[in-house]
Each structure stands twice: as structure tokens, then as C-alpha cells.
Amino acid sequence: MMKIAATLLATIALATVNALDNGLALTPQMGWSSWNFYACNINESVIMNTAKAMVSNGMADAGYTYVNIDDCWAGGRYPNGTVYADPTNFPNGIKYVADYIHSLGLKIGIYTDAGTETCQKRVGSYGYEANDAQTYAEWGIDYVKEDWCYATLENPQQRYQIMSQALNATGRPMFFSLCDWGYENPWTFGMSVGNSWRTTPDIKDNWDSMLSNLMAQAPITSFSGIGGFNDPDMMMVGNGGMSNTEYVSHFSLWSLLNAPLIAGCDLIDIDQETLSILTASEVIAINQDPLGVQGSLVKSYNGGLQQIWAKPLSNGARAVVLFNTDTNPATIELLWGNIWMEPSQQLSIRNLWTQTNLGTFTESYESDSLIPPHGCIMLTLTPTN
């Protein structure tokens, strides 16, 4: 038991040092981004109506705070270097949109690039970091995502440090999201310059892409913690490329990983099943647990076809996802040793998706029904004493 406790304490300690001290990212960020569904087809109406929908459909009440404008908003720069919005799609400017979003009690995010151009060839922030940061502050921006297109000859830690310092110098707290797609191991330096850092290439709306981005997190869980989080990319839940069973697994695992919960579907015309996944309160609570420890892969069976992912919670409980990656149904057995518990410990188990208590167990728990192909069961296990 002492060895198990020492391992757990070491994980927590590694996850809470060297954080960028801007007072943000005490828990993973939650919100919505325009890219996955709209790509470049954005305008002020889309952004403002999405924000309005987040309030009316319960997303805001569930914790989704940020409304993030991704690439294609920028129109260019004035002669003095100040960036301005595309006058066709954002005729009233970004501050107008920001003021509206703030009036709803939400926050606004903006996109830029560490290179000379963004990925869609709009103006990047290279050499204009201080100018852009001040402009964002004047607009009332709360969140900045900085991409890595046309910056590949640069050192990402140094380049991102420039924008990080520029944002902090404005005096306005702005969440800083780094995005070099994991190419230069940003988890090794991200905590010192940003609040989250992409660890993978862009996610696609299919099973293989989601699974690939998930598995890329397994070796780097100790680099995430309060103040800065590993980012396996925005969620694809609701975009139609996967089944709802797969989307439940996607959302469960992103929640357990302390990944940013950034929705990427159409929230204006969202279906009820997608909304119920994205607003699952007991699942979201695992992501937002204040202990801030990222979940990790603790056990695999059958060559990785069945997996157990787990994380400790602030109340002494454990959150667990029993994950079946196989194309056939399966049962999965969880041993207490897998989750840093003594075999004799009595644990009360709750299913977070059905919101039902399953009883009290010692030593182990085996799923009482077959887990469907690409499906999961998400549990909390709480000591009875």
C-alpha cells in the first residue's frame, strides 16, 4: 500500500509544479470552438447565435464558458500594425461580438498563429505579439489560441513565451492555448508558458482518429495539472462521423483525461442525444474535479482491446472508465490494486451515465453486463469509511 500511495502522490506532485501563474486553468477549460463544424464559414451571426444557444440549451449552465472564434476571422492589419476583423463577416468588429457574449455571462476566445500567417493564410502574430495582445485586451478577449502554421523553423517554446509574456503584460487575464500539434513535445514546456497545449495532430470525426489521440495521452499524463492541461484536441461529439456509443466513450475519456471540454458541433441546431452527452453532469464533474490529476491508463487486457483508465478525485474516490475498443462485446474486471486501493477496502460504486448506485464491493468489480463494441462504463468508486 505504501508503494501505491507513493506513486499516487508523485503523480499529483508532478502535476502541480512550474505552472504559468496567470490565475487561470484551475480546472480544464470548457466551451465551444467554431472550427470543427464551420471551418472558415464563420461570421458574427454564427458566433453570436451560438453563444445565445449555449445559454438557452443548458450548455452554459453545465459549465461551458468560452465561445471561441477559430481561424478565418482576421481581415488584415492597418498601417500601424493593428489587426482588424474581416469587414464582410464581422462588420461590427470583434469587440461588438465580445460585448454581446459577455452580456450573456459567457467569455470569448480568439485565434491567432505564431507564424507570419494562420493555417488559412490570414495574418499571423509573428513579430506583432505585443500589438495583438494589447488589441485583444482592448476588445475584451478572454482566451487566445495560438496555432503553429508557417512557424516551423522557430523554437516553439521561445515563440510561445513571447506571446505568453505579451498577454500577461496587458493586465487582462487571458487563457493561453498552445497548438503545435504535439510535434515538439509541448508537454515538456507548456506548463511554464500556457494553460493548455495540443498533444496530437488535428482530430478527425472518426473512431480511429479519436482512439489515436486518446492513446497518445498515455505516456504523458504526469505533465498535466492545475494551471495547465494536455489537450488531445476539441471534441467531435455530435458531428455525425461516429456512433453515439463511440461519442459517449469519447466524452467519458476526455473527461477522465482532464482534457479541455471544447465542443465542436452545431450548437444552434443540436439534437437532444448529443446535448445529453455534452451536458452529462456527473461525467463533467470528473473533468472539473479540483484535485486536477489527469486520468491514466492503468490496465490493458487482450492486447489493449479492453482498457481501464482511472484517476484519483479530491474526495478520496476514484473515477474509472472501463473501455472496450474491440468490435465485439466484452466484460472487464477491475482490481482495487489497479486504482491505488487496498483489496480489503470497501468501495461504493456508482455508474455515472445511468446515475445509479451499483452497491458496495471489495477486492474487485466486473462489469455486470457486456460492454458494447467501442463502448464504455464510467464509474466512481468511493471508500465507505
From Swiss-Prot:
Any GO BP: carbohydrate metabolic process
Keyword Hydrolase found: yes
This protein's record includes keyword Hydrolase: yes
GO MF annotations in UniProt: alpha-galactosidase activity
Annotated binding of substrate, by residue: 180-184
EC annotation from Swiss-Prot or TrEMBL: 3.2.1.22
Active site (catalytic residues): 147, 202
Keywords: Carbohydrate metabolism, Disulfide bond, Glycosidase, Hydrolase, Signal
Signal peptide: 1-19
Enzyme class: hydrolase
Family assignment from sequence similarity: Belongs to the glycosyl hydrolase 27 family.
Protein name: Probable alpha-galactosidase
